């Protein structure tokens, strides 16, 4: 079942031709305000696109991110996040200011033959000590570009 916020975003983006382009990725952006957690469902869009009504436009900052690639069921996503935080710590990285986010590699989300989603989990990080990084750890670090997002806030978080 696709959440209503994704449905709203897709209904807005579809007529604008923003769904199936190679540069258009569906993203969930997590925002922490103290102990409160909210999530914005976003779609990468060209800079000239404007939001309207419930759809707002924002910026996802570039920087250094630990990125994990997963093909998992939606019920496995919390465990994947836990694994990501464990791995970043193990590889001499620590989460830093910025927003963690998920990038869904297939739109629509319900097309996987085994009801799984292909997803990248992204955590903004800083290196604790570059000298301690092992060769294999570097593969989880990526310099991300700044991305324009059209988004709608998910209800119920």
Residue ranges and their predicted role:
Residues 1-128, 157:
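A solvent-exposed interaction/effector surface
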Residues 127-157:
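Binding-site signature for planar aromatic cofactors or substrates
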């Amino acid at each position: 079942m696709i959440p209503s916020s994704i449905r709203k975003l897709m209904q807005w983006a579809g007529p604008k031709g923003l769904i199936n382009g190679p540069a258009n990725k569906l993203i969930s952006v997590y925002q922490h305000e103290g102990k409160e957690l909210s999530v914005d469902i976003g779609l990468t869009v060209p800079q000239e696109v404007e939001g309207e009504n419930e759809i707002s436009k924002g910026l996802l900052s570039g920087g250094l991110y630990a990125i994990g690639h997963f093909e998992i069921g939606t019920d496995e996503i919390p465990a994947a996040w836990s694994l990501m935080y464990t791995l970043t710590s193990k590889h001499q990285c620590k989460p830093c200011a910025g927003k963690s986010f998920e990038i869904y590699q297939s739109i629509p989300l319900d097309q996987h033959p085994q009801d799984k989603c292909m997803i990248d989990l992204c955590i903004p990080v800083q290196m604790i000590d570059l000298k301690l990084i092992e060769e294999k750890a570097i593969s989880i670090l990526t310099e991300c570009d700044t991305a324009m997002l059209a988004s709608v806030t998910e209800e119920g978080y």
